[in-house]
Amino acid sequence: MSAKIKVDEISSIIKERIENFELNINIEETGKVVNVADGVASVYGLKNVMANEMVEFENGVKGLALNLEENSVGVVILGSISGIVEGTSVKRLGKLLRVPVGDALIGRVVNALGEPIDAKGPIEYSETRFVEEKAKGIMARKSVHEPLQTGLKAIDALVPIGRGQRELIIGDRQTGKTTVAVDTIINQKGQDVICIYVAIGQKQSTVAQVVKKLEEYGAMDYTIVVSAGASEPAALQYLAPYAGCTMGEYFRDNSRHALIIYDDLSKHAVAYREMSLILRRPPGREAYPGDVFYLHSRLLERASKLSDELGAGSLTALPIIETQAGDVSAYIPTNVISITDGQIFLESGLFNSGIRPAINVGLSVSRVGGSAQIKAIKKVSGTLRLDLAQYRELQAFAQFASDLDESSRKQLDRGQRMVEILKQPPYSPLPVENQIVIIFAGSRGFLDDIPVSAIGKFENELYSFIEAKYPNIFEDIRTKKTIEKDLEENLAKALNDFKMTFSVK
């Protein structure tokens, strides 16, 4: 007996199969390399590619579409150009460049793409973010009101920095710009601030030295180092600051505080100029392309102090600019000065005369940091800037005048001691309470009878003396953050007691 065919059952199975059928066709738009030179490839055939879209070469190297022309696309190569020749096929990836973010990066040295370069194994990250993010709007921000202590007396007293500020460090080569930045990172220990140090166009040996110093002082426990060395393609040097900024924004957006240092944006502008000229973009002043201002403004505007509704996190930026022979009126320095909230100007003349950090107090300014400065340091350093300016004027006058009146001589002597107080050896940031004590001693005349050569010894021994005999002074300054009459009297008593025991020899 022949089996009866169940027509209804078969037709329902066929219908179900048709309904569940998925046609997986992966359509890829590809093009060919027309020519390649200096890390930039000209690609024909990618008709629908978008600006800043990622592309991939047949050998797996990624690229970034920067120039969209009528018949070709200018692609900067994010890696080695070996193996990329005329005729190499390129495919669109349909996405923008992203980098890993999060706590997994802390303590690591990565390149501009967030890949580890410190031989400590892969990074187990759980989140990535776009390298190019839009800066927060006005309503998402809050005015800068919390201090970010650098540990340097000259900065914390005269050019204070607040969390969420952009403060430029500017000066000639070999004037201690990186040292100021590294000191600031070291001083964030225990302050719950994540630091990101972005090295752009630096020698690998220089970056290794910085990392070694940070490890030596235990600062790598809260620091990420992003390095795009001098030997790396201009495209990676161009991307490094944006990648570092994205990593910092992750902490800011999660109600935490971050500090980012761009060392330095002069080399960043040079890398962008190199890329732009190879892409045949029209050059402008000093051969930089027309959008070089936007290059830095869109980066530095991302630093901010967020409103309470968004978690009150902050990202503070300390960009570094290298000048030529102290010329701050060049194109890139003036651009960055106009973008930032103030600048710390380092002078080679001061550096060579032994005043280190070599900060020119007259030219350095902080436009918003004053509202973030704690009351105690504001009180003791209130007239310090004016006193130093008058001292410099008198000093210039004293070179020509042989006899000075008593008040001028006193002013000169006091000024000399204040300059000596503001000197600080590298990699030894001071807690703010120690800074307040020594500036109080100098500005109130307690050091007038101490020889200038003995000021350093006096300062070091004073901290130990107060710690041992008057520990409540440091504690009161730390907790109250202001100097009231009783604390002022107690501090004056401590200074007088110490002077009785202090020996110059």
Swiss-Prot record:
Class in the EC hierarchy, top level: translocase
Main location: membrane
Topology within the bilayer: Peripheral membrane protein
Entry's EC annotation: 7.1.2.2
One annotated GO molecular function: proton-transporting ATP synthase activity, rotational mechanism
Keyword line: ATP synthesis, ATP-binding, Cell inner membrane, Cell membrane, CF(1), Hydrogen ion transport, Ion transport, Membrane, Nucleotide-binding, Translocase, Transport
Family affiliation: Belongs to the ATPase alpha/beta chains family.
Protein name: ATP synthase subunit alpha
